[in-house]
UniProtKB/Swiss-Prot annotation:
GO terms for biological process: fatty acid biosynthetic process; malonyl-CoA biosynthetic process. SUPFAM superfamilies: ClpP/crotonase. The gene is accA. It is found in: Cytoplasm. Belongs to the AccA family. This is Acetyl-coenzyme A carboxylase carboxyl transferase subunit alpha. Keywords: ATP-binding, Cytoplasm, Fatty acid biosynthesis, Fatty acid metabolism, Lipid biosynthesis, Lipid metabolism, Nucleotide-binding, Transferase.
């Protein structure tokens, strides 16, 4: 059963009441058709009111939903003949990042993304989508290979952050992320980055330097989690909801600030409600981006990417 978020409970309660009335009607001689139709109209209005007016904290909850589609869900639906590569050729394999090659509309591309698990066992194996340095080095190796063979790069971002453990730090976590930022800025192929869940801090940025940055409607992208920000600002992590309201971490806010290029719509109730439809919406955005970026020369791709990031954070008084 799909977990229910707290703000969705009025919708679920009304749906249960409709099901109850339908069952009663089928098993009795009393016709409640009009009452059911009235409740269904009320349900439609309620869904529109709740899902159409989500607060930042609600979007954080949606981004963290345990059933939210992962990178692999989209790879299976958008790309063909995908072959995953493994290892960074320095230390080992990191299953928190998936990286490989495949075809998009009959054209070869390199696809890289954070990968969470679907259950406890897989989450432990994939370290809950929090990469070690070898994950970022693996990704960079494949991005450099993409440049060598002139393949566009598409990345899917979905991580709470890079793994902060002692072993990861000893193996150069910060250096691995920093090198990815530097190298991605200068790669002479199109790079499209899509935030599909949580885009947490440097762990997200390690796959997030691109020509086009897109976000799903209910994803988040921030330098720190709302809980972390609340702990720093108010010494109280339970103030996360308040922090989320002020941090500007949602797709609509980041689009307005010029951090991202497009907000990708989600099916009503979130991407997990209809993965196929969500994949189709992402597919359309990838197609639009590639059509635009493939017209640019390698020099123009790099120049526009540099210009994009140089303008971030500027403002006029």
């Amino acid at each position: 059963m799909t977990p229910i978020l707290d703000f969705e409970k009025p919708i679920v309660n009304l749906k249960e009441k409709i099901v109850e009335l339908k069952s009663f009607t089928e098993n009795s001689e009393i016709d409640l058709t009009k009452e059911i139709e009235t409740l269904e109209e009320r349900l439609a209005r309620l869904e529109e009111d709740i899902y159409g007016n989500l607060k930042p904290w609600n979007r954080v909850q949606m981004a963290r939903h345990p059933d939210r589609p992962t990178t692999m869900d989209y790879i299976e639906r958008i790309f063909t003949d995908f072959i995953e590569f493994h290892g960074d050729r320095f230390y080992g394999e990191d299953e928190a990042i998936i990286s490989g090659i495949g075809y998009y509309k009959d054209s070869p591309v390199t696809v890289i993304g954070h990968q969470r698990g679907k259950d406890t066992k897989e989450n432990i194996r994939r370290n809950f989508g929090m990469p070690h340095p070898e994950g970022y080095r693996k990704a960079l190796r494949h991005m450099q290979q993409a440049e060598k063979f002139n393949r566009p790069i598409i990345t899917f971002i979905d991580t709470k952050g890079a793994y902060p453990g002692k072993a990861a730090e000893e193996r150069g976590q910060s250096e691995a992320i920093a090198k990815n930022l530097m190298e991605m800025a200068g790669l002479q192929v199109p790079i499209i980055c899509i935030v599909i869940g949580e885009g947490g801090s440097g762990g997200a940025l390690g796959l997030g330097v691109g020509n086009h940055i897109h976000m799903l409607e209910n994803s988040t992208y921030s330098v720190i989690s709302p809980e972390g920000a609340a702990a720093i600002l108010w010494k109280d992590s339970t103030q996360a909801k308040k922090a989320a309201e002020t941090m500007k971490i949602t797709a609509p806010d980041l689009k307005e600030l010029g951090i991202i290029d497009q907000v990708i719509s989600e099916p009503r109730g979130g991407a997990h409600r209809d993965v196929d439809s969500q994949a189709e919406l992402i597919d359309n955005i990838i197609k639009q981006s590639l059509v635009e970026l493939m017209l640019l020369s390698s020099e123009e791709l790099v120049d526009k990417r540099w210009e994009k990031y140089k303008q971030m954070g500027t403002f006029m008084s």
